[in-house]
Regions:
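Function-determining surface determinants
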Residues: 1-506
Length: 506
């Protein structure tokens, strides 16, 4: 592997003109002879998911003319494209090859789309020693952002040499002047910084002495921002996670209004319950379709394709439900709700006589006590509705903890959330088995009304139903031990240690 040293050129861009580059590298000519290669120019489109999943994993994906190029540890990888790609794109829509194999796991269920487009030029200069032997290559590259904003060209000079001493000697000569500096990071990083990306839209952190009404309004504005940020992706069906994150923000809003909405002036809006109901059918179908291949592989009888008519029916149902979802999200009712709510929150005066710390002590105590009381009441004879109620209370505690996290002691917070998540996982498995069983029966009835599905499909669906019932029974069996662990003295001690004693309501 050749040695690479990265430098930054601080002078005016050269456009990679032959004479201009040779002039800037002239400090090397007393020792070396320089032979410039041809000038190359291209456009690059950098791709990532909306939440920057590739970048977080050290991957840089570019669409160049006719190919996808991925840089990262162990790379680069390149896949030639059969035609012009369409963005956004899920992993399954990418051309088969090394690039898709590498990014599929990082992308998860999210789609990639252009983050920025750049115009790039480069020229390689061969460095020869006194005997005429090539000892290094100097690549002079200039990159300018084109979209979403135009940026001035950034010049990156890369010294490559088989031997470390040659690379270091050339770099040392260049760095002796005042126009070169040591560089680090990638071209992509530099372009992102110059373009003001990634955007970081964050609300002020909640502090202990903040008025309670201002603290709650701040948290709710953050949730409103999250709802707004996911509307377009949901309407355009970019990927299923946009709808999921929109729903999470709605649930957080409703939970916080229930827990601390009395701190705000006026009656809380009731429209978020409507948004929850509007988005539920499509999300339920998304979950089914995302898990479909896994469910099909569980089948122990029949053929793998027996469930394909069921998949097609789910897609038909989803298309129908999505039409209603899109109408709702594009309606005046939804826009009035979101705009009016955000405006009202921005007008909260912050005149409460109660501090955020005092409110946290009071409400976390109430919500935690409610969870512990419901958890202690669960027995083997408890109804599914009782278990579902406990799950809802656990979510409310989880959201409350997230809101007041800046005020909590870090270690007790970590332990409380860990214990709570463990219980939520069991409760979720129980409810998923119940809900999916009910939905499966409903989908089977609708398939029969729409036509005459193959007997093999109905038999395979029957096996799925049995597995959902088995999942629910297994979760019910696991629930007892999960509750015992959660109700132990450790959880109560950790809850008590979340906040200073003076803040914890008695």
């Amino acid at each position: 592997m050749p040695i690479e040293l990265i430098l930054r050129w601080q002078g005016r861009p050269t456009g990679c003109g032959r004479a201009e580059i040779l002039d800037q590298l002239s400090v090397l000519t007393p020792t070396y002879r320089l032979t410039p290669g041809p000038r190359q120019a291209w456009d690059a489109t950098y791709l990532d998911t909306v939440d920057w999943r590739l970048r977080k994993r050290g991957l840089v994906l570019r669409h160049l003319a006719g190919s996808l190029v991925l840089d990262g540890e162990g790379g680069p990888w390149r896949t030639e494209l059969p035609g012009e790609p369409q963005w956004p794109a899920l992993a399954g829509a990418l051309a088969p090859g090394e690039v898709r194999d590498q990014v599929e796991r990082a992308m998860w269920v999210r789609a990639i789309a252009p983050k920025l487009r750049s115009s790039e030029v480069s020229r390689e200069v061969t460095v020869l020693d006194a005997e005429g032997c090539a000892v290094a290559e100097v690549e002079w590259a200039e990159s300018a952002g084109v979209e979403p904003v135009q940026t001035a060209p950034l010049t990156r000079v890369t010294v490559r040499a088989p031997r470390k001493r040659d690379a270091e000697r050339i770099a040392r000569i260049l760095l002796a002047g005042d126009q070169f500096q040591s560089g680090e990071g990638t071209v992509y990083d530099a372009l992102l910084t110059a373009s003001g990306l990634p955007e970081r839209r964050t609300r002020p952190a909640i502090t202990a002495d903040m008025p309670a009404d201002a603290a709650i309004a701040t948290a709710l504005l953050g949730f409103a921002d999250a709802i707004e940020a996911n509307v377009a992706g949901t309407v355009e069906d970019v990927d299923t996670e946009f709808l999921h994150e929109l729903r999470v923000a709605v649930r957080r809003t409703r939970s916080l209004l229930k827990i601390a909405g009395d701190m705000l002036p006026g009656a809380p809006p009731k429209g978020f319950k409507w948004v929850g109901a509007l988005t539920t059918p499509t999300r339920d179908l998304d979950v089914y379709l995302l898990r479909f291949d896994e469910l099909a592989r569980r089948s122990t009888v029949g053929e793998l394709g027996d469930l394909e008519p069921f998949r097609q029916h789910l897609r038909w149902e989803r298309a129908r439900e999505r039409r209603a979802l899109v109408r709702g999200l594009q309606s005046k009712k939804f826009r009035k709700l979101l705009d009016g709510w955000s405006a009202a929150l921005r007008e909260v005066a912050g005149g409460s006589g109660v501090t955020a710390a005092e409110l946290a002590g009071e409400r976390l105590h109430l919500v935690a006590d409610d969870v512990l009381r419901h958890a202690a009441a669960i027995t083997p004879a408890s109804t599914a509705e009782d278990v579902h109620t406990l799950r809802k209370r656990c979510k409310e505690l989880r959201y409350s903890l997230e809101v007041f996290r800046p005020l909590c002691a870090p270690e007790p917070y970590r332990k409380v959330v860990k214990n709570l998540k463990r219980l939520q996982d069991v409760l979720g498995a129980f409810q998923d088995g119940e809900v999916q069983s009910a939905h499966l029966r409903l989908y089977a009835e609708r398939m029969l009304r729409r036509g005459d599905p193959p007997a093999a499909t109905l038999l395979a669906m029957g096996e799925l139903l049995a597995r959902f019932v088995e999942q629910q029974q297994h979760a019910r069996h696991s629930l007892g031990s999960a509750l015992d662990k959660f109700l132990g003295a450790g959880t109560r001690e950790q809850l008590a240690a979340l906040l200073p004693a003076a803040q914890w309501a008695s």
